[in-house]
Amino acid sequence: MEFKEGLTFDDVLLVPKYSDITSRSQTDLTTKLSRNITINIPFVSANMDTVTESSMAVAMARAGGIGIIHRFLTIQEQANEVLKVKRSGSVMIENPYSISSDKSIQDALDYAEDKEISGLLVVDSNSKLVGIVTERDLLFAGSNGTIADVMTKDVVTAKPGVSLDEAKDILHKHRIEKLPIVDDSGIIQGLITSKDITNNTDYPNASKDKKGRPLVGAAVGVKGDFLERSESLLNAGADVLVVDIAHGHSENAISTVRNIKKAFPDCELIAGNIATAQGAEDLIKAGVDAVKVGVGSGSICITRVITGSGVPQLTAVMDCAKIGNDHGIPIISDGGTRTSGDATKALAAGASSVMVGSMLGGTDESPGTVLTKNGKRFKVYRGMASLAASIGRKSKETGSISLEDDLNDYVAEGVEAMVPYKGTVTDILKQLAGGVRSGLSYCGAHTIPQMQQNAEFIKMSRAGFAESQPHDVLLM
C-alpha cells in the first residue's frame, strides 16, 4: 500500500516574492463564491446554528462576504431569516409589511415585534395605502382601539421610478424616515427608508444582488423536505443554496444535487463537504456551481477521530482546486482556518473563498447568549454533527425527542464547546481581510487569482513552525 503525504496550514509557508505593491489598498479581494456569484472579500460564515442566522449574514454581506443560514430551523423560520437579510439593506423594499386599518393596536404591536420592524404601512380592504403607523404612534397608545385611531393619515408618498436622490430630497424636505412608493391607484409598490439609504452609503464594499439587496445563502439537507425547503428559501430570496452533509462524496449528496438542479435549474448550488479530487469531479458532474472542501478539519469536528477518515486541509484544497479549475468551478475551503495566514494559504492553494466558523462564533452577531465562567465571558459553539445539535435538529423536525433512542442510535462526529466572547464580527472581518491583503502583497499579487499563479509553498519542520511563532519573550 502506498502512503500519500498530506499537509495542512501549519506544515507550510508561502515564499515571499518581489512586490510592486506600496499599499494594501492596491490589492483586490474580489473573488468568485460560485459559478455566477461574486463577493468582495473571500469569507463565508459557516452554516452552523451557533454561527449564522440573519444578524451574522447581514454583517457578512455589509463587509463584502456572505453568510449561509443554517438549516436547523423549520422551513418557515429559515425562510424568515433569509427575508430579514434581504430587507436589511434593500434601497427599496419591494413587498413592505402592511396591516389593515381595522386591526387592533395590539395586532400591530405583535406584528411589528414578530417581524422586527419599527413601522407598518396601513391599507384598506382594497389594499390601498391609507396611512402609516410607527413605534412613536404606538408607544403610549395602549392595546385598545384600532390602528385607524392612531395612524398617520396624511402620508407623503412617491411614484414608482423615483430616483435615490429624489427620495433623499423628499425624506429631508418632510423630515420623515419612511417613503411609501404607490402607483396611480394607490396600491403599494415598495418602501424606501432613510435607514436603508444610509446603509447603502455606509457600506460601499457590501456584497449585493442585482436589486441592491444583501447577498445571502441558506443550507438544505439531503433527506425529507429538501425540495420543499429549497423552494421556500429561493422564494424568500436566497441567492445560493448549500447542500449540507458531512460526507459529500456520497449518493445521498449527488442525488440531492441532481434533484435540486432539475427542480430549480437556475439556482446557484454549492455542495460538500468533500476532500478528494474524485469527490469534486463527481459533484461537478452532478451540476454544482461550487464545491465545499473539508472533512474533519474544523475545530469542533471529530470525524477523523471517530471514523479515521479525512485529508489534511491544504492537500484537500489543492487536489480539489485542480479539478475545479478544469471545469471553471470555485472551491470553498471549509475548516481548519485559525488565522488570516491560514486563510491566505488556503486561497493560494486554489480556494476561491474560505468558510469560517470558530473565528466568528462568540461574536455579537452569532446566535446564542453570552455566558460567564470564572469571570470571563463565552458563547456556545458546537459542531453540527455533535449530539446536542442532533437532538436539537430532531426536536425541530418532529416536535419531540426520545433521549434514550437518540443516545443509542447516534454516533457524534462533533463536540459542543465554549469560545471566548469576541465583540462585533466587523472587527474580526477587518483583521482577516487586512491579513489576506498583506499576504497578497508578500506574494507580489494584486488579486487572489494572481496570488494563486505566483504562489510557491515551502514545507517546514516543527522547528520551523516554532520559529514562526512568538518565541524567547514573555508575552504581555
Curated annotation (Swiss-Prot):
Keywords from the UniProt entry: CBS domain, GMP biosynthesis, Metal-binding, NAD, Oxidoreductase, Potassium, Purine biosynthesis, Repeat
Active site: 301
Binding residues for K(+): 296, 298, 301, 467-468
Xref: PROSITE patterns: CBS, IMP_DH_GMP_RED
Binding site for NAD(+): 244, 294-296
Pfam families the record matches: CBS, IMPDH
Residue ranges of domain CBS in the record: 92-150, 151-207
HAMAP family attached to this UniProt entry: IMPDH
Subunit (UniProt): Homotetramer.
Function in brief: Catalyzes the conversion of inosine 5'-phosphate (IMP) to xanthosine 5'-phosphate (XMP), the first committed and rate-limiting step in the de novo synthesis of guanine nucleotides, and therefore plays an important role in the regulation of cell growth.
Protein name: Inosine-5'-monophosphate dehydrogenase
Encoding gene per record: guaB
Regulation of catalytic or functional activity: Mycophenolic acid (MPA) is a non-competitive inhibitor that prevents formation of the closed enzyme conformation by binding to the same site as the amobile flap. In contrast, mizoribine monophosphate (MZP) is a competitive inhibitor that induces the closed conformation. MPA is a potent inhibitor of mammalian IMPDHs but a poor inhibitor of the bacterial enzymes. MZP is a more potent inhibitor of bacterial IMPDH.
InterPro entries per record: Aldolase_TIM, CBS_dom, CBS_dom_sf, IMP_DH, IMP_DH/GMP_Rdtase_CS, IMP_DH_GMPRt
EC number: 1.1.1.205
Annotated positions binding IMP: 299, 334-336, 357-358, 381-385, 413
NCBIfam families reported in the protein's UniProt record: IMP_dehydrog
Family: Belongs to the IMPDH/GMPR family.
Catalytic activity: IMP + NAD(+) + H2O = XMP + NADH + H(+)
Pathway(s) this gene product operates in, as recorded in its UniProt entry: Purine metabolism; XMP biosynthesis via de novo pathway; XMP from IMP: step 1/1
GO biological process: GMP biosynthetic process; GTP biosynthetic process
GO molecular function, one term: metal ion binding
Cofactor dependency: K(+)
